Design a protein with these regions (language model features):
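Non-catalytic signal-transmission and effector/linker regions of two-component phosphorelay proteins
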Residues: 1-6, 117-130
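Charged docking surfaces used in two-component/phosphorelay signaling
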Residues: 18-26
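Helix N-cap/capping motif at the beta->alpha junctions
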Residues: 33-42, 63
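Short amphipathic alpha-helix used as the core "switch/output" element in two-component signaling
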Residues: 42, 64-77
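Active-site beta3 strand of CheY-like receiver
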Residues: 47-53
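Active-site residues of response regulator receiver
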Residues: 55, 85
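Receiver (REC) domain active-site loop signature in two-component systems and cognate sites
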Residues: 58
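Alpha4 helix (beta4-alpha4-beta5 surface) of REC/receiver domains from two-component response regulators
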Residues: 65, 88-110, 117-121
Length: 130
């Protein structure tokens, strides 16, 4: 029986997604990648992962909308979601805030630049693997 945990990384920056994917695979996770919110939702519906790393600012559907849709769906509401955003550290008011992230019922919220190690640590904690 395969007990390997599956992680979906949804980020429109291929280089960042690749770094996170590589780090997670080194830690023994199976990783799938999507490059926008619509593709991410399709991958969740086709094969639900054990956890999701979800960028906030993406084309087609942003991470807040994707997170909200998943948390409101009984089939997917228990999948841990980590939201990532580059705007959390901005002093000026933006359309994306930490409070917005937590309002989506995300399980964790990490500001970019986030290290792949920080993301891996959060996933392990959320999946009770730490």
């Amino acid at each position: 029986m395969n007990l390997q945990k599956r992680i979906l990384v949804v980020d429109d920056e291929p280089d960042f997604a690749s770094i996170v994917q590589g780090n997670l695979e080194k830690e023994g996770f199976a990783v799938d990648v999507a490059y926008n919110g619509v593709e991410g939702l399709q991958k969740v519906q086709a094969n639900p992962p054990d956890a999701i790393v979800l960028d906030v600012m993406m084309p087609e559907k942003d991470g807040y909308i994707v997170c909200r849709e998943l948390k409101e769906d009984d089939k997917y509401c228990n999948i841990p979601i980590i939201l990532l955003t580059a705007v959390a550290s901005h002093v000026t008011s933006t359309r994306y805030t930490h409070a917005d992230g937590m309002a989506t019922e995300a399980d964790d919220y990490i500001a970019k630049p986030a290290s792949a190690e920080e993301i891996t640590k959060s996933i392990k904690k959320l999946l009770d693997l730490s």
